[in-house]
Amino acid sequence: MFEKLYQFYDFYSYFVFTYFINVFFHYVIDISYYDISSKYKIIPLPKLELLNLYQKYLPVVVKNVIISPIPFGVIAVHLVNLDSLYTTRFHITDCIFELVLTATITEILFYIFHRIVHIPFLYKRFHKLHHSVTTPVSVATLYVDQWDMLFSNSIPLVFPVFFICSTTITAKIWFIFILTESILSHAGYKYLSEAHNKHHTDININYGNNLFMDKLLGTYG
C-alpha cells in the first residue's frame, strides 16, 4: 500500500514540477519581456494588471495541487498497478504507439468529463470558478474548484497514462506534452490559445484539447 502510494506521488510530483516550470517560463515571458509578449496576446493587459492576475490565481492553484492528490492517490493505488512502469524496458516504437493511444483516449475522456461539468447544476457548483477567468493567463490552467480538479482534469488527463503507458519514461514524456499543451491553451497568445479562449467566452463550443471530438460532435467553433 505505502509503496504504491510512493510510486503514485513520485509521478504526481513530476506532474506538479512540470506544471510550475511551465508557468514560471510563461511568467518570465509575460512580465520580464512584457513589451514583446504583449504584442502577441489575444487580450493585452497593462503589466501591473497581468501581474495581479498571477497573484490572484496562484494561491488557489497551489492549494489544488497539494490537496487534490490526496483522494486521487488513494483511489489510484487501488485501481492501478504501477510496478510494471518501473520494470518494463523502454522501446521507442512502443513509446510512440502508447503516446498516440494515450492522446486519443485522453481527448475522448476529457471531452466527456468536460461536457458533464457543463451540466447547469455541476457547472454552477464546480466549474464556474474556472470560467471566471475571462483574460487568459498560463497559471489559470489549474484555477479550478478542487473537485473539478479531480473529476475533469486529473481523471481524464492522468489515469490513461497508468493503463496505457508501459514505462516511466513514456509516462513522463506524456506529462510534459499534455501540461505544455494545456498551459499554452490558457496562456492567451494569438493562434496558440484562441480555440480555448473561445470556450471561455462561449461555453457551448470547444470542449476538447485538440478539438477532434468537437469537430466530430459538432461543438467546434
Model-derived features: where do they sit?
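Non-catalytic, topology-defining segments of multipass membrane proteins
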Residues: 1-128, 132-161, 207-221
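Functionally important transmembrane alpha-helices
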Residues: 164-216
